[in-house]
């Protein structure tokens, strides 16, 4: 059973601001002090305050690879803890010290604590000694400048084991201008993942999207082909 930590503000996702609206005000905070300032000031409109419902479903339906898992841009750590189990050790990665402090405060006493860890590192340069069987990305791809996406794909390839699986929750599939979050499409993922050696195994709608993200997300599962 996935452990789900909820907070009073976003316990059911209904209060989460639509991505098109977030893109109107979030860039100012990011420009002023990066993602650390967002967490320091509590400007985290993407944080659902609980594990992503789709992640909970994948865990409870035993639809995730076992072994070592990675959640880049883990923020408050909700998805990390939901995925963690005796059969799956999960690393939550973030560049914000404040985000990881919040994650540790929330989940430090979790009965799952020995099955996950939080690490402050830059996803683009961090290379651990051991690779991963599973990587889950929801918010990194849409948060980075579009010209940085090829580097994101390269890092994914280098961090994943040859037989590992990359799961991307494609978001936000909209037509808004600016960001973060920057708009995405299936093709924007394909354009950077296919050239480095990934193949999409499946791409489908996310039936577990929260209200303000319905119709704006797709679940894609990728495997290395070379």
UniProtKB/Swiss-Prot annotation:
PANTHER family: (RAPE) HYPOTHETICAL PROTEIN, PTHR32183. S-adenosyl-L-methionine binds at residues 35, 39, 46, 73, 94, 122-123, 138. GO terms for biological process: methylation. The modification Phosphoserine is found at residue 85. It is an enzyme of class 2 (transferase). CDD domains: AdoMet_MTases. Keywords: Methyltransferase, Phosphoprotein, S-adenosyl-L-methionine, Transferase. Its EC number is 2.1.1.n4. It catalyses: thiocyanate + S-adenosyl-L-methionine = methyl thiocyanate + S-adenosyl-L-homocysteine. InterPro entries: SAM-dependent_MTases_sf, TPMT. This is Probable thiocyanate methyltransferase 2. The gene is TMT2. The keyword S-adenosyl-L-methionine applies. It holds the Pfam family TPMT. GO terms for molecular function: S-adenosylmethionine-dependent methyltransferase activity; thiocyanate methyltransferase activity. Coiled coil: none annotated. Belongs to the class I-like SAM-binding methyltransferase superfamily. TPMT family. The keyword Lipid biosynthesis does not apply.
């Amino acid at each position: 059973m996935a452990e789900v930590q909820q907070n009073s503000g976003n316990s059911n996702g209904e209060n989460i601001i639509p991505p098109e609206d977030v893109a109107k005000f979030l860039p100012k905070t990011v420009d002023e002090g990066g993602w650390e300032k967002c967490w320091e000031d509590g400007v985290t409109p993407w944080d659902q305050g609980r594990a992503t419902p789709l992640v909970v479903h994948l865990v409870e339906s035993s639809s995730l690879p076992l072994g070592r898992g990675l959640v880049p841009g883990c923020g408050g750590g909700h998805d990390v803890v939901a995925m963690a189990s005796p059969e799956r050790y999960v690393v939550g990665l973030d560049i914000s010290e404040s985000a990881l402090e919040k994650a540790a405060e929330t989940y430090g006493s979790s009965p799952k604590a020995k099955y996950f860890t939080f690490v402050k590192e830059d996803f683009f340069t961090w290379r651990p000694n051991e690779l991963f069987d599973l990587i889950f990305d929801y918010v990194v791809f849409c948060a980075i400048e579009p010209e940085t996406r090829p580097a994101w794909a390269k890092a994914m390839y280098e961090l994943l084991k040859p037989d590992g699986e990359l799961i991307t929750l494609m978001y936000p599939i909209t037509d808004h201008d600016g960001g973060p979050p920057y708009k995405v499409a299936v093709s924007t993922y394909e354009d950077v993942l296919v050239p480095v050696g990934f193949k999409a195994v499946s791409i489908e709608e996310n039936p577990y999207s929260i209200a303000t993200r319905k119709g704006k997300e797709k679940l894609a599962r990728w495997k290395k082909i070379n």
